[in-house]
Amino acid sequence: RRQRQMCIRDRYGTVLFFEDQKVVKGLQEAFPSYQDNFPGWSLQTSAMHQLAIWVMLEDVGFGASLQHYNPLIDDEVRRAWNLPGHWHLIAEMPFGLPVTKPGEKEFQPLEERVRVFK
């Protein structure tokens, strides 16, 4: 845990990802047939933005990680940047110069996770 805190402390910056609940609610009201889908679609959009920004940071030589300290830090973040209450914190992405290479990870085989139908 101490090592993780050091890595986060020594970062250059942190990208914070939010979901504007007013926008999601507005879409639910405008398109009631799809209202149950908008929260999930919003999270999927956020995930795509997280990946795109991570790749962009890596492309210019930074290392990054995706963290989820919310809801533990939500109120503090809102106060620090004077953010509206309807902005829901999704994730944090600290970034900086990499000091080590990422460790190897084990994944379930791709053929067990992805199916292609023709």
Say what each PLM segment does:
Residues 3-8:
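Short, small-residue-biased leader/transition segments that mark boundaries at the very start
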Residues 82-85:
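Short, hinge-like loop/turn segments at secondary-structure boundaries
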Residues 21-23, 99:
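Active-site/binding-pocket entry motifs
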Residues 62-64, 87-91:
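A short pocket-lining beta-strand/turn micro-motif at the edge of beta-sheets
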Residues 15, 21, 28-79:
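Small-aliphatic-rich amphipathic alpha-helix that forms the alpha element of a beta-alpha
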Residues 16-17, 94:
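Short, well-ordered beta-strand micro-motif
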Residues 1-2, 89-118:
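C-terminal helix-cap and adjacent tail motif
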Residues 11-14, 90:
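Short, surface-exposed beta-edge/turn micro-motifs
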